[in-house]
Swiss-Prot record:
Belongs to the OctT acyltransferase family. It comes from the Bacteria. SUPFAM superfamilies: SGNH hydrolase. Sugar octanoyltransferase likely involved in the biosynthesis of mycobacterial methylglucose lipopolysaccharide (MGLP). Catalyzes the transfer of an octanoyl group from octanoyl-CoA to the C6 OH of the second glucose in diglucosylglycerate (DGG). DGG is the preferred acceptor, but to a lesser extent, GG (glucosylglycerate) can also be used as substrate. DGG and GG are the two earliest intermediates in MGLP biosynthesis. GO terms for cellular component: plasma membrane. One of its GO terms (biological process) is protein tetramerization. This is Diglucosylglycerate octanoyltransferase. Transmembrane segments: none annotated. It catalyses: (2R)-2-O-[alpha-D-glucopyranosyl-(1->6)-alpha-D-glucopyranosyl]-glycerate + octanoyl-CoA = (2R)-2-O-[6-O-octanoyl-alpha-D-glucopyranosyl-(1->6)-alpha-D-glucopyranosyl]-glycerate + CoA. Its EC number is 2.3.1.273.
Length: 247
């Protein structure tokens, strides 16, 4: 770590794969085209991006309390962004705990058989399936994480986000759980004066027009830029100055 890196604030982002996937797939955390790096560059900060495909707000709680990267980044963080909630709201044919156990099925032929079966069932049952995480649990995990971060860094600016939209065939294009998740996150954020970024407002035009990733979920770089602009506005609302604009 360079001395310059040690002196600069860090933007600590907890995210699902929407933060680091582009129009053709996943990208390294230092790719300048993804929104976390656009935001960090505009602030002249370092970026600590902690995330994984499929993460919900429950995973953010686990990461914030168990991942040593989060422990190292928090003391010098200038702000924290919770960029999850989308997976919480997507339909899940199986309970999350069971679905995540598929990767551990042995032998390998049986695991492939189970995965293929789940891939067949998911788009067909998604229109009637429950959300992956009940909305009240989404809000509870956000609050637990906020409380833990605020305990260690009282008053640090925190931003949260509302779920994106999708047209993914793998989910039968179903997203009936979004409204409940939006309501729960909004109520929690209002109670704690947390600025919100509505990812739908930033990316809907690109996604619903078919200009995102072919999977129907992830975004193109125009959408990443639009998200970055809304994140910067939310950070300004939380009291974080835009360094380059001030300069």
């Amino acid at each position: 770590m360079s001395s310059r890196r040690g002196r600069r604030p860090a933007l600590l982002v907890f995210a699902d794969s929407l933060a680091y996937y582009g129009p053709t797939g996943g990208l390294p955390a230092d790719d300048p085209r993804i929104w976390p790096n656009i935001v960090a560059s505009q602030l002249d900060w370092d970026l600590e991006l902690i995330g994984r495909i499929g993460w919900t707000c429950r995973d953010v709680w686990w990461a914030a309390t168990q991942d040593p990267r989060a422990w190292a980044a928090l003391p010098r963080a200038g702000a924290v962004i919770f960029a999850t909630g989308g997976m919480d709201s997507l339909p899940s044919v199986l309970p999350t705990a069971l679905r995540e156990l598929i990767r551990y099925v042995r032998p390998s032929w049986l695991r492939r058989w189970v995965r293929d079966g789940y891939a067949w069932v998911q788009p067909r049952l998604s229109p009637v399936a429950r959300a992956a995480l009940p909305p009240h649990l989404t809000a509870e995990y956000l609050e637990k994480t906020r409380g833990a971060i605020d305990f260690n860094r009282p008053g640090i600016p925190i931003i949260a986000s509302l779920p994106s939209v999708h047209i993914a065939e793998t989910y039968g294009k179903a997203h009936h759980g979004r409204a409940g998740t939006v309501a729960a996150i909004t109520e929690w954020a209002q109670h704690h004066d947390i600025p919100l970024v509505d990812l739908k407002a930033a990316v809907a035009e690109q996604i619903l027009s078919g200009y995102g990733n072919r999977d129907g979920i992830h975004w193109n770089f125009e959408a990443h830029q639009a998200v970055a602009e809304l994140m910067l506005k939310a950070l300004a609302e939380a009291g974080v100055p835009n360094e380059k604009s001030r300069g």
